[in-house]
Amino acid sequence: MKADAKQITHLLKPLRLLLLGAPGSGKGTQTSRLLKQIPQLSSISSGDILRQEIKSESTLGREATTYIAQGKLLPDDLITRLITFRLSALGWLKPSAMWLLDGFPRTTAQASALDELLKQHDASLNLVVELDVPESTILERIENRYVHVPSGRVYNLQYNPPKVPGLDDITGEPLTKRLDDTAEVFKKRLEEYKKTNEPLKDYYKKSGIFGTVSGETSDIIFPKLLNLITSKFG
């Protein structure tokens, strides 16, 4: 992975960004790079939150496990309650807040519910970007992907391997495979994603805040993503 350019320490207005993309398209990787590049930006990942809940075997975690293991998306009410509660708990429901959402909303119903909440606090989304990656590239990625669940750090045995095989670089704790990181589950998740993503894209296109960046690797996509952000907010 190439080193990123100089940090962006100031934007002309607060950025509230939603990243869209198929499972395995690299949303987590792009999020990590954006957080390093734009220090004042914070992030919230529905996937990371859910995996933490599953690991802790909370009521929400047990309920979510049934859907995730089958490659199904979570019901709107379940994920919406979780995310909106977390946004409030983090103090991000204010006009000056800068944040990035990964993995939520996934349906127009979720998007509408989120918009209503954010409008009440004058903190609406102002940029939605889809990561467009070939399906064959994504399948190869997930077959080689391992994660450190507590932190959400993601490794790939081909292009981003851990320093010590099977262990997290920072903590030395074991890495694991996600329940949904199999070819069979991926294909189910991809079909589910396609069904909901087109209406979601149309929803955000109408608001004039939607954009797309395409590429096969993180190093190709990230400069395009950064240029899109700086052209609108820099």
From Swiss-Prot:
One of its GO terms (cellular component) is mitochondrial matrix. GO terms for molecular function: adenylate kinase activity; ATP binding; GTP binding; nucleoside triphosphate adenylate kinase activity. The gene is ADK2. One of its GO terms (biological process) is ADP biosynthetic process. Depending on the yeast strain, the GTP:AMP phosphotransferase is encoded by ADK2 with or without a single base pair deletion/insertion near the 3' end of the open reading frame, resulting in a long or a short form. The ADK2 long form (this entry) is also referred to as AKY3, while the short form has been named PAK3. A sequence of the short form can be found in strain S288c (AC P26364). The modified C-terminus in the long form contributes to protein folding and is critical for protein stability. Keywords: GTP-binding, Kinase, Mitochondrion, Nucleotide-binding, Transferase. Optimum temperature is 30 degrees Celsius. Active from 30 to 55 degrees Celsius. Belongs to the adenylate kinase family. AK3 subfamily. Monomer. InterPro entries: Adenyl_kin_sub (IPR006259), Adenylat/UMP-CMP_kin (IPR000850), Adenylat_kinase_CS (IPR033690), Adenylate_kinase_lid-dom (IPR007862), ADK_active_lid_dom_sf (IPR036193), AK3/Ak4_mitochondrial (IPR028586), P-loop_NTPase (IPR027417). It is found in: Mitochondrion matrix. Involved in maintaining the homeostasis of cellular nucleotides by catalyzing the interconversion of nucleoside phosphates. Has GTP:AMP phosphotransferase and ITP:AMP phosphotransferase activities. Does not accept ATP as phosphate donor. It catalyses: a ribonucleoside 5'-triphosphate + AMP = a ribonucleoside 5'-diphosphate + ADP. Its main location: mitochondrion. The lineage of its organism: Eukaryota, Fungi, Dikarya, Ascomycota, Saccharomycotina. GTP binds at G24, S25, G26, K27, G28, T29, R145, V154, Y155, S218. Its EC number is 2.7.4.10. The keyword GTP-binding applies. Optimum pH is 8.5. This is GTP:AMP phosphotransferase, mitochondrial.
